[in-house]
Curated annotation (Swiss-Prot):
TM spans (from-to): none
Alphabetically ordered keywords of this record: Acetylation, Coiled coil, Ribonucleoprotein, Ribosomal protein
GO molecular function, one term: mRNA binding
Name of the protein in its database record: Small ribosomal subunit protein eS7y
Superkingdom as given in the UniProt entry: Eukaryota
GO BP annotations listed: translation
Modified residues annotated as N-acetylmethionine in this record: M1
GO cellular component, as recorded: chloroplast; cytosol; cytosolic ribosome; cytosolic small ribosomal subunit
Similarity comment text for this entry: Belongs to the eukaryotic ribosomal protein eS7 family.
Organism: Arabidopsis thaliana
Gene of this entry: RPS7B
Chain coiled-coil ranges: 17-50
PANTHER family with a match to the protein in the record: 40S RIBOSOMAL PROTEIN S7, SMALL RIBOSOMAL SUBUNIT PROTEIN ES7
Length: 191
């Protein structure tokens, strides 16, 4: 009995793609077979899943989760990513919360747009989602002579073991999602 359909909630009238069905089936199987994840996964669902080709022959699975369920997914993030990466062998799994960007209000309009709906705010929040579970401890923006920008993001070195293997994937996913160049690094700690 396939009942993974309640693991994905898309906009009305939009059917899930074949890849999204694979992801929801994997989540459904995890819920039924893995006892420690069963209770946490019971009420969780996703909005969308996309497979991205990153530089070289690497692939990434980007799973969009509802903004309201972001905290619940973060509680089980490490275990869930480990299990999903086993199922999708050779692909890095990244969870990103679904957020909306509102266009700036027209001149003379009295409508205020919330800060969390601005392009800058959404891109910063996506950066945090992509880098999770590592915490961002610093950012530097470097302007080259030709006018291009590169953002250096310093990650907390406590979780270096959990994130170091997918730094390249995180860079590629962030570039595809936002169009901005970013470099992830761990700050050198002087003893």
């Amino acid at each position: 009995m396939y009942s993974g359909q309640n693991k994905i909630h898309k906009d009305k009238g939009v059917a899930p793609t074949e890849f999204e069905e694979q992801v929801t089936q994997a989540l459904f199987d995890l819920e039924n077979t893995n006892q420690e994840l069963k209770s946490e996964l019971k009420d969780l669902y996703i909005n969308q899943a996309v497979q991205m080709d990153i530089s070289g022959n690497r692939k990434a699975v980007v799973i969009y989760v509802p903004f309201r369920l972001r905290k619940a997914f973060r509680k089980i993030h490490l275990r869930l990513v480990r299990e999903l990466e086993k199922k999708f062998s050779g692909k890095d799994v990244i969870f990103v919360a679904t957020r909306r960007i509102m266009r700036p209000p027209k001149k003379g309009s009295a409508v205020q747009r919330p800060r969390n709906r601005t392009l800058t705010s959404v891109h910063e929040a996506m950066l945090e989602d992509v880098a999770y579970p590592a915490e961002i401890v610093g950012k530097r923006t470097r302007y080259r002579l030709d006018g291009t920008k590169i953002m250096k993001v310093f990650l907390d070195s406590k979780l270096k073991n959990d994130t170091e293997y997918k730094l390249e994937t995180m860079v590629g996913v962030y570039r595809k999602l936002t169009g901005k160049d970013v470099v992830f690094e761990y700050p050198v700690i002087e003893a």
